[in-house]
Amino acid sequence: MAELRLPPNSVVKKGKEHKEQEEMLKPRKVKIYRYDPDLDENPTIDSFEIDLSKTGPMVLDALIKIKNEIDSTLTFRRSCREGICGSCSMNIDGTNTLACIKPIEEISGDIKIYPLPHMKVVKDLVPDMSHFYAQYESIEPWLKTDSPTPSNSERLQSIKGREKLDGLYECILCACCSTSCPSYWWNGDKYLGPAILLQAYRWIADSRDDHTGERLEDLEDPSKLYRCHTIMNCTKTCPKGLNPAKAIGKIKSLIAERHGV
């Protein structure tokens, strides 16, 4: 008989409770996933009571308040605070999103914050993005041309050619979509996932790129591309309102056209 076991330190336990001593006008409890691999202990869910009347409107504001005033060991990424850099991607209230643009008022009850699913956790809310970025590098996300670079101008593009990149170039590589995709959970070692495939199509669709055929040939692989089963979690969760599933469909259509289908 097979003996099934959970990996070491995989059971999430109840952690510390930090209660506010002063009277609060707008009390709210924030529950945060905590994990430090250096301690060789199970992850925990720590609870923090904060006064929303003394913090900003976004979830990131609450995290910064907790780190600055309650527990300085709380670890998370953040930078722009404008939904541009993608640093503060995490799972909030069951949905992958950006903490800096997620309004607290949209969340009912306790605010529950976890790191992005599927990825190895570096510490607390910080996921290891190494594999994700390696996959991004594999699609060669830069302009590949055969003609020499113009000496006195940039490579020009028509207005219509530029419009084809709308809904693609805005991707900030936050990984919210890829880590919400069950196909990526199951086959993340080979399947590129929605974020990387959207980025791949961004270069395929660029009228200035001369290597469309080569890019499509590289993606024509049972694992890299065709593990997409149109579950649509990617489109639902994208904090920028993009549609990775549509981009994946476009790639499949172009490959089919190359085979006369």
From Swiss-Prot:
Residues 28-119 form the 2Fe-2S ferredoxin-type domain. It comes from the Bacteria. [4Fe-4S] cluster binds at C171, C174, C177, C238. [2Fe-2S] cluster binds at C80, C85, C100. A ubiquinone binds at W186. Gene3D superfamilies: 3.10.20.30, Alpha-helical ferredoxin. Residues 161-191 form the 4Fe-4S ferredoxin-type domain. It holds the Pfam family Fer4_17. Its cofactor is [2Fe-2S] cluster; [3Fe-4S] cluster; [4Fe-4S] cluster. It catalyses: a quinone + succinate = fumarate + a quinol. The keyword Iron applies. [3Fe-4S] cluster binds at C181, C228, C234. GO terms for biological process: respiratory electron transport chain; tricarboxylic acid cycle. Keywords: 2Fe-2S, 3Fe-4S, 4Fe-4S, Electron transport, Iron, Iron-sulfur, Metal-binding, Oxidoreductase, Transport, Tricarboxylic acid cycle. Pathway: Carbohydrate metabolism; tricarboxylic acid cycle; fumarate from succinate (bacterial route): step 1/1. Residues 1-23 are annotated as: Disordered. One of its GO terms (molecular function) is 4 iron, 4 sulfur cluster binding. Its EC number is 1.3.5.1. Binds 1 [2Fe-2S] cluster. PANTHER family: SUCCINATE DEHYDROGENASE [UBIQUINONE] IRON-SULFUR SUBUNIT, MITOCHONDRIAL (PTHR11921:SF29), SUCCINATE DEHYDROGENASE IRON-SULFUR PROTEIN (PTHR11921). Part of an enzyme complex containing four subunits: a flavoprotein, an iron-sulfur, cytochrome b-556, and a hydrophobic anchor protein. Belongs to the succinate dehydrogenase/fumarate reductase iron-sulfur protein family. This is Succinate dehydrogenase iron-sulfur subunit. It comes from Rickettsia felis (strain ATCC VR-1525 / URRWXCal2). The lineage of its organism: Bacteria, Pseudomonadati, Pseudomonadota, Alphaproteobacteria, Rickettsiales. The gene is sdhB.
